[in-house]
């Protein structure tokens, strides 16, 4: 039965990028990630990008997009110019390199990624509008929640998405998704880069997802993060918000490092979480980690597949089609399925970056709390 539900919801989710040709560029447009009023960078109809940098005294200037470097040429006005190759749709970090020094672009908004505040450009994808704001959709809120951690002996901040109906239905209680960022990012990532609130608002407007809270927490706390999440974050959220405080109404998901945490914390605590999403995790292989060992990582599955499946309402794994992790992830999924696990697996166009993660979230939340 679970497999049938997975298949139906997956087909519905695929429709998100199969509609009218929204996102098609017919003339150069300023990037949505530019600081307001800045003309450049500009995205061209072929998805190449024109960058301009005013640095008349510099000796050499280049743009570094995800480690691909584009040397720039200085024009007569002292402005450095380059047009890149066509870019893949989605969100990409970039840096300027001026006389060998890597800097952020003063024309771009800044986003925390690569463990620094980085410039970025968001390339539209033709036909994909599930993460774009729409005028006639009720808007939820993203609330900054500050709280004290006895474990860290420090103040922490998490962000909480609250659906638009929350204040108008004071007697209603809500399930909760705990959504984790990747390495080199922080609790702002799923809001600013991932567009979680927009994705949720659009799905709720179409009645394709259940109203829920989404908690986005800082996960780079070393070995203490699991303790903080289980013993401090979740009790704090349950005390301050109207939640349904049981495992069937609680989910955990994350990208890359956050996907590994969803396994090591979420999957290992079925009394807390009955819904797990793992997006592009390196724990299955494809990066520098040791090969995935099913007997070591999931002995409970091998011991009792039926109990393993009964503990989970949704077990979801995804990866980008050109992510180095894809082959190893698919092999791990097949090994777990052979052992009896019921898993939904999806692969999306793209590498280890935000467009596949946005699509993963969009698909995953439609499966939750049904």
What are these regions (language model features)?
Residues 1-4:
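Positively charged n-region of N-terminal signal peptides that target proteins for export
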Residues 6-7, 56:
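General helical structural elements
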Residues 7-15:
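Bacterial N-terminal signal peptides
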Residues 18-19:
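Bacterial signal peptide processing site
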Residues 25-32, 43-70, 74-370:
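Non-catalytic cap/lid and distal C-terminal segments of serine-dependent acyl enzymes
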Residues 38-42:
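Short beta-strand segments of immunoglobulin-like
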């Amino acid at each position: 039965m679970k497999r049938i539900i997975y298949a139906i919801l997956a087909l519905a989710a695929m429709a998100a990028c199969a509609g009218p040709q929204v996102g098609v560029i017919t003339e150069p447009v300023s990037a949505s990630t530019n600081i307001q009023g800045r003309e450049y960078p500009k995205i061209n109809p072929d998805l190449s990008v024109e960058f301009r940098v005013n640095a008349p005294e510099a000796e050499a200037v280049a743009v570094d997009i995800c480690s691909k470097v584009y040397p720039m040429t200085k024009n007569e006005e002292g402005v450095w110019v380059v047009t890149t190759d066509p870019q893949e749709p989605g969100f990409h970090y970039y840096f300027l390199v001026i006389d060998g020094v890597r800097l952020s672009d003063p024309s771009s908004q800044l986003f925390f990624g690569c463990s620094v505040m980085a410039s970025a450009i968001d390339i539209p994808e033709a036909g994909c509008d599930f993460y774009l704001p729409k005028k006639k959709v009720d808007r939820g809120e993203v609330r900054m929640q500050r709280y004290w951690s006895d474990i860290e002996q420090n103040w922490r901040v998490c962000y909480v998405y609250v659906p638009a109906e929350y204040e108008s239905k004071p007697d209603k209680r809500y399930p909760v998704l705990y959504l984790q960022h990747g390495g080199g990012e922080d609790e702002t990532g799923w809001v600013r880069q991932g567009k979680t609130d927009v994705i949720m608002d659009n799905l709720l407007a179409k009645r394709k997802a259940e109203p829920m809270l989404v908690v986005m927490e800082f996960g780079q706390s070393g070995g203490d993060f699991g303790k903080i999440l289980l013993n401090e974050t979740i009790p704090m959220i349950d005390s301050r918000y109207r939640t349904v405080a049981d495992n069937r109404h609680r989910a955990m998901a994350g990208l890359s490092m956050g996907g590994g945490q969803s396994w090591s914390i979420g999957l290992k605590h079925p009394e807390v979480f009955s819904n797990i999403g793992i997006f592009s995790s390196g724990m299955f292989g494809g990066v520098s980690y040791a090969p995935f060992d099913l007997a070591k990582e999931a002995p409970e599955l091998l011991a009792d597949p039926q109990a393993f499946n009964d503990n989970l309402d949704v077990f979801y794994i995804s990866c980008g089609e050109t992510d180095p992790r894809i082959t190893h992830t698919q092999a791990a999924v097949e090994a777990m399925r052979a052992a009896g696990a019921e898993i939904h697996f999806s692969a999306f166009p793209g590498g280890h970056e935000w467009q596949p993660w946005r699509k993963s979230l969009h698909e995953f939340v439609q499966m939750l709390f049904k």
